């Protein structure tokens, strides 16, 4: 640890903490150091912490993407394990949403969030074998001061294993995790599609999916939107766009894996169409009622 100067603690979890530090051997480069404390843990907790640490090291050390933290090294002391990676400035998407009026983000912003996350998941799923993140939620998405989104916390990410009936360990965050993550089947990239659907639904409705897992009410009542200038738009056009978004998110959240979108590229394409339509038609002239805003 002499190589690193600890600046501050930036996070804490069940098994340890995350620190912002300077790497003295690399021009005081800012890094994040994830500490897993093993001292005093019960045997089962020690096994879980060790497994999560080893998974994160195995996955991060193989990845190179501008929206993922770069892995530098890992080491251990008699009482703790440490993982050193890029320090990502900013706040989590969960923190960012909590500061919005009524917790509601602009629809254009939610679409941008989805379009930023899709290429990251696409990159993970394109690995050989595919990497399934398995824990996509606002608390694991960092938003930098420039608005860039990065995924953090690969503690339960796993490689897809062809022919395996189900995951070795059932893990995930309640409400965001796909039903197959609860031990009923092996997770595939479509599990991340489900989680992305849960995130988008929460950003659009402010409804926390952990309050009632697998229950996702409609985004808005039918014909609940009225243009500011009735002459500029018709309610039917608004409904067409919102129905398209509703249909996409509902398909992402279906319990049946086979009925979800085939891959994240399809989701990205649909979001691009909706986002472009929104931009081309509305140009800021229309402001929906509570629940959806531009």
What does each model-found stretch correspond to?
Residues 167-180:
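Conserved activation segment of eukaryotic-like protein kinases, specifically the C-terminal portion
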Residues 40-62:
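AlphaC helix of the eukaryotic protein kinase fold
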Residues 74:
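Activation-segment/catalytic-loop signature of the eukaryotic protein kinase fold
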Residues 192:
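Conserved catalytic-loop aspartate of Hanks-type protein kinases
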Residues 78-92, 96:
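Conserved short submotifs of the Hanks-type protein kinase catalytic core
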Residues 119-131:
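Protein kinase catalytic-loop region centered on the HRD/HxD motif
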Residues 7-14, 18:
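Protein kinase glycine-rich loop
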